[in-house]
């Protein structure tokens, strides 16, 4: 990944030079592209790229590559349109800007974003050296990210890339952090410019997605880049064409050391060609990029190598663009930092623009690189490792601008992947209308193709940057065709993979803001856009994520092919697609209703026509229940109530036994008679045996009669065993002699002598007699 990222670094430097860095900064990658106007768009795209940042830098990369070709204004305009749809619509109606036109020249980026204006001014001052610095300082447009990364990367020798990386790193890109040391100086510059471009950062803040959601920023940045590319045909088309995450662009930049992605901030469309020729001249930055590469190898991001060439071209074509795009370039560098982690994504994003577009969009990973050259280079590096540089130089120059233009239309797809993307898409579409005459369809196609190519390239890049690179490489053969094809893919399902989102963004940017927005929002829903925008968008998230894994830089070479700005067509077609044929209202007359449902079909409710018919029941013939017919004619009425009281004649009633005697009894206290009859029980009742004797007994203390029968059996009793003991008992003598007395009559054997106790014998007889009486 270190090598691929280094390659991407080259591309990312390129992206930075072209303004991809600005986008990247915005989206962690893409934000730098249109720091001023694209900051908002970049923010949106940045979110897209930030996710890429983690593992998919393709959105940023795509944007970077797309941006590589387009000028800073193109990049700025798209970002502005995307980031601030309202602003874009009002301030930047998205007039198509010449590919070579810089953001300041076009006035697109400056109008939308104060940050861009500041960046543009700064960039104008230092056209060559400051282009890079401003690229990075513009990253301060997303200063939070750029500064963070810069601080994190004190050793960042590559200021342009450093800011980009820093911008991206705030997005949360590991690679960015790695490159932080390398980009620390850049980050410092970025901070300085950040103060200048704080307005830009606020735009990004408005984009919100850009820095806060690093990952979202990557995607959003990508979307913004694509949208920016759409707004400014070259810049926007390139990002859209890249359709890959900023890392893809970063990888492309890395893969193409000669092509500092960062250097290329907003390079003109022909900047790629210049870069090709100027790459040697850019070598000063190249060494810087080389060091960046080393750091990228260390950080897995190489931004310096490609930065100078792009910067030179950017300076040549749009020094203001470099100022603005340099800021984007810083984001592009951020994308390059991401490039390592998202490098493959960037490559993949570049793959979508195999044609010259892709080379231009190759730095798309680097939001700043707006020259497709970067993409092409990245593609070459991914595929060939070196050939990519030349291709990128070629296709990046013209195709990149075209690609960026086309990409803007494709950008809408990027928005689709993320919520921020959709917002960006609307903005992007607003910009897209600007290059409607441009190959908007191509843009949409390129993003699609790029998306698939980017994915393949990324896979290859991940595997060897050869498999996926080859897909893009295949696309490169027909760089223009592929650029168009890539843009067409925006319409077609293939595009959705990764570049599609970028392409969609570009395409949508191309279309009028309202149209593009609807396209972005609708692409996923409408079948037509689903191919162009929806497929790209839905595919784009996945594609981007895939792109990070798949190095698509080789395929990006095709991006070099200047993609005709058909993206506007794509957005238009997307719109037409989105517009579903009006569905005629169902003919209810011919519809068979459910059972009984048509009976009231003609019913017209009317409150006054209600007739209540009361039918009186003829009860004369009705046989009522027993007695119920008597009252049938009874009419309740308070005045005619008659209560018939019939007293009950009890004279004829035979009462129960004894009850008739009291029938005339009237309760009253005066006529109470109490009759007491004493019953003589003795006369009528026969008592039980022996019980009658006491029937007349009245309880009383004086009349007690106690009959006592003395039992003497104890006295006469003898123990069965003679144990020699004496039996002592109380004699039941009436006299009351209760003192125990010695039984003298007890034999020695202990047996009682009954003869000596006549009382006991008598008692026994009485008891037996009494028991006999009772029947016992």
Swiss-Prot record:
Modified residues (N6-acetyllysine): 480, 560, 594, 616, 625, 633, 646, 652, 656, 666, 678, 682, 704, 720
Acetylation among keywords: yes
Modified residue annotations for Phosphoserine: 46, 61, 214, 502, 526, 530, 533-534, 537, 549, 570, 572, 597, 620, 624, 628, 640, 659, 687, 691, 731, 735, 739, 744, 751, 757
Keywords of this entry: Acetylation, Cell membrane, Cell projection, Cytoplasm, Cytoskeleton, Isopeptide bond, Membrane, Methylation, Microtubule, Phosphoprotein, Repeat, Ubl conjugation
Chief location bin: cytoplasm
Record PTM Phosphothreonine, positions in chain: 69, 71, 111, 470, 486, 492, 498, 540, 547, 552, 566, 738, 762
Annotated stretches, region: Disordered: 1-591, 733-752
Protein name: Microtubule-associated protein tau
Organism of derivation: Pan troglodytes (Chimpanzee)
């Amino acid at each position: 990944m270190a090598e691929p990222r280094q390659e991407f670094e080259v591309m990312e430097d390129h992206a930075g030079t072209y303004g991809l860095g600005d986008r990247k900064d915005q989206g962690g990658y893409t934000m730098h592209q249109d720091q001023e106007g694209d900051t908002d768009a970049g923010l949106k795209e940045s979110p897209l790229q930030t996710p890429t940042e983690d593992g998919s830098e393709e959105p940023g990369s795509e944007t970077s590559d797309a941006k590589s070709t387009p000028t800073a204004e193109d990049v700025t305009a798209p970002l502005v349109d995307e980031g601030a749809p309202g602003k874009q619509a009002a301030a930047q109606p998205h007039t198509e800007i010449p590919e070579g036109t810089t953001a300041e020249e076009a006035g697109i980026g400056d109008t939308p974003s104060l940050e861009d204006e500041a960046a543009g001014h700064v960039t104008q001052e230092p056209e060559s050296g400051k282009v890079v610095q401003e690229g990075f300082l513009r990253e301060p447009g997303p200063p939070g990210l750029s500064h963070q990364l810069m601080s994190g990367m004190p050793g960042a020798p590559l200021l342009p890339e450093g800011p980009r990386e820093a911008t991206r790193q705030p997005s949360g890109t590991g690679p960015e952090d790695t490159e932080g040391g390398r980009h620390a100086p850049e980050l410092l510059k970025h901070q300085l410019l950040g103060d200048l471009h704080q307005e830009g950062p606020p735009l990004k803040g408005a984009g919100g997605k850009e820095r806060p959601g690093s990952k979202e920023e990557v995607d959003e940045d990508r979307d913004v880049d694509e949208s920016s590319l759409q707004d400014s045909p070259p810049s926007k088309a390139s990002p859209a064409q890249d359709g890959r995450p900023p890392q893809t662009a970063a990888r492309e930049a890395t893969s193409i050391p000669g092509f500092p992605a960062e250097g290329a901030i907003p390079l003109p469309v022909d900047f790629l060609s210049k870069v090709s020729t100027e790459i040697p001249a850019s070598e000063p930055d190249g060494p810087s990029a080389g060091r960046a590469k080393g750091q990228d190898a260390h950080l897995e991001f190489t931004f310096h190598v490609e930065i100078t060439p792009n910067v030179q071209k950017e300076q040549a074509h749009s020094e203001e663009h470099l100022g603005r795009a340099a800021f984007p370039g810083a984001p592009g560098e951020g994308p390059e930092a991401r490039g390592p982690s998202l490098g493959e994504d960037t490559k993949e994003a570049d793959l979508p623009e195999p044609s010259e577009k892709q080379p231009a969009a190759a730095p798309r990973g680097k939001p700043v690189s707006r020259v497709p050259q970067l993409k092409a280079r990245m593609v070459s590096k991914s595929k060939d490792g070196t050939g990519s540089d030349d291709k990128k130089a070629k296709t990046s120059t013209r195709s990149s601008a075209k690609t960026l233009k086309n990409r803007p239309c494709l950008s809408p797809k990027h928005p689709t992947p993320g919520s921020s993307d959709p917002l960006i898409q609307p903005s992007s579409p607003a910009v897209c209308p600007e290059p409607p005459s441009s190959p908007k369809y191509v843009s949409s196609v390129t993003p699609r193709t790029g998306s698939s190519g980017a994915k393949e390239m990324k896979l290859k890049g991940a595997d060897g940057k050869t498999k996926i690179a080859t897909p893009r490489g295949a696309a490169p053969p027909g760089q223009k065709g592929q650029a168009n094809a890539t843009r067409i893919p925006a319409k077609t399902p293939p595009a959705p993979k990764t570049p599609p989102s970028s392409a969609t963004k570009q395409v949508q940017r191309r279309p009028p803001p309202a149209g593009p927005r609807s396209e972005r929002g609708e692409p996923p829903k409408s079948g037509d856009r689903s191919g162009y925008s929806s497929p790209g968008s839905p595919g784009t998230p996945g594609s981007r994520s895939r792109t990070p894994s798949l190095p698509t830089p080789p395929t990006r070479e095709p991006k070099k092919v200047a993609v005709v700005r058909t993206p506007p067509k794509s957005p238009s077609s997307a719109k037409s697609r989105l517009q579903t044929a009006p569905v005629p209202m169902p003919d209810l007359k011919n519809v068979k209703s459910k059972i009984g449902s048509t009976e009231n079909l003609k019913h017209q409710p009317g409150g006054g026509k209600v007739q209540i018919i009361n039918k009186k029941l003829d009860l004369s013939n009705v046989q009522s229940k027993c007695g119920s017919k008597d009252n049938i004619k009874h009419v309740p009425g308070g005045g005619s109530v008659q209560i018939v009281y019939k007293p009950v004649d009890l004279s004829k009633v035979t009462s129960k036994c004894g009850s008739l005697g009291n029938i005339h009894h009237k309760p009253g206290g005066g006529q109470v008679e109490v009759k007491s009859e004493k019953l003589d029980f003795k006369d009528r009742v026969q008592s039980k045996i022996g019980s009658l004797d006491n029937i007349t007994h009245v309880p009383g203390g004086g009349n007690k009669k106690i009959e006592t029968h003395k039992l003497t059996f104890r006295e006469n009793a003898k123990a069965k065993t003679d144990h020699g003991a004496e039996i002592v008992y109380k004699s039941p003598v009436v006299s009351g002699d209760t003192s125990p007395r010695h039984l003298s009559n007890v034999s020695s054997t202990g047996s009682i002598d009954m003869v000596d106790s006549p009382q006991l014998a008598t008692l026994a007889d009485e008891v037996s007699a009494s028991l006999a009486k009772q029947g016992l």
